[in-house]
Design a protein with these regions (language model features):
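Thiamine diphosphate
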Residues: 1-300
């Protein structure tokens, strides 16, 4: 945000009393007040009101680009505002951080599980979960340029590595190949967000040709032509494994009837983020084991 704030002087917004945690404050931007000065809005601890205010600003005259931010878990509190934004085709932007069990010790009350599927179920909402800093740049680009509906960004709390082959521009296509074997792929790993790094590490350890697909936005991928979708996910490759730290609901659209999902079908746990992720199977070793078992089953 600091990098592009000078180029987006009409962008205003803030957080539901979590600006320091979500990192969504324009430094030096001042606080919006009765004099209408400042770009930072102090919404207070009231997520639904924040969403409604963001929608109202978006409705005003189209001159301002409003955003509201909180933890992803608290998107439940503002769901109706998000739905109205989608229904009304507003240019509202929602920035949700702390997007998985990887957030750590705050535990199940703060760890999103069903939220990816729930938010993807809202028609006309772009839900983007970038893998690293490069994809986050691309996600912001989509968010600032998209018309005809709201955009939601789901970002991690934990640090993630900058990956070698991620692309800012490719985010606009919803999904793309970040790793391909020398030979035709026999297994495809499909991941979103911080789990893309796990998929890439697993692919390095696989003894069969394995493709890795980053899928930051289902909705944008669905809007691509069938030729591109089949190029990314060849129909003849049935051994497809999704890797996402949430429920598997909806993933069979992409992994197919014979594919499998590494998912979380229960509430989280209070422990350091890496410990929770390892406990729930988000390790390269587990991905390799699941992928090889899937390939064997599909091939038999």
């Amino acid at each position: 945000m600091e990098a592009f704030k000078r180029y987006t002087p009409t962008m205003v917004g803030g957080a539901a009393d979590l600006a320091e945690s979500t990192k969504t404050e324009f430094k030096g931007g001042g606080v919006f007040s009765a004099t209408h000065a400042g770009r930072n809005i102090a919404f207070g601890i009231r997520e639904f009101a924040m969403g409604a205010i963001v929608n109202g600003i978006s409705l005003h005259d189209g001159m301002l680009k409003p955003y509201g931010s909180t933890f992803l878990i608290f998107s439940d509190y503002m769901r109706n505002a998000v739905r109205i934004a989608a229904l009304s085709e507003l240019q509202s932007l929602f920035v949700w951080t702390h997007d998985s069990v990887g957030l750590g010790e705050d535990g199940p009350t703060h760890q999103p599980i069903e939220h990816y599927a729930s938010l993807r179920a809202i028609p006309n909402l772009l839900f983007i979960r970038p893998a690293d800093g490069t994809e986050t740049v691309g996600a912001w680009k989509v968010a600032l340029q998209h018309e005809g509906g709201p955009v939601a960004l789901a970002l991690t709390r934990q640090k993630v590595p900058t990956l070698e082959r991620t692309s800012a521009d490719a985010v606009a296509r919803g999904a793309y190949v970040v790793h391909d074997p020398d030979d035709a792929p026999e297994v495809i790993l499909i991941a979103t967000g911080s789990e893309v790094a796990v998929a890439l590490e697993a692919a390095k350890r696989m003894d069969v040709p394995t493709r890795v697909v980053s899928m930051p936005c289902w909705e944008l991928f669905e809007r691509q032509g069938s030729d591109y979708r089949d190029e990314v996910l060849p129909p003849d490759v049935k051994a497809r494994l999704s890797i996402e730290a949430g429920v598997a609901l909806g993933w069979h659209k992409w992994v197919g009837d014979e594919g499998d999902c590494i998912s979380i079908e229960h509430f989280g746990a209070s422990a350091p983020g890496p410990t929770v992720l390892e406990k729930f199977g988000y390790t390269a070793d587990n991905v390799v084991a699941r992928a090889l078992a899937l390939r064997e089953r599909v091939s038999s």
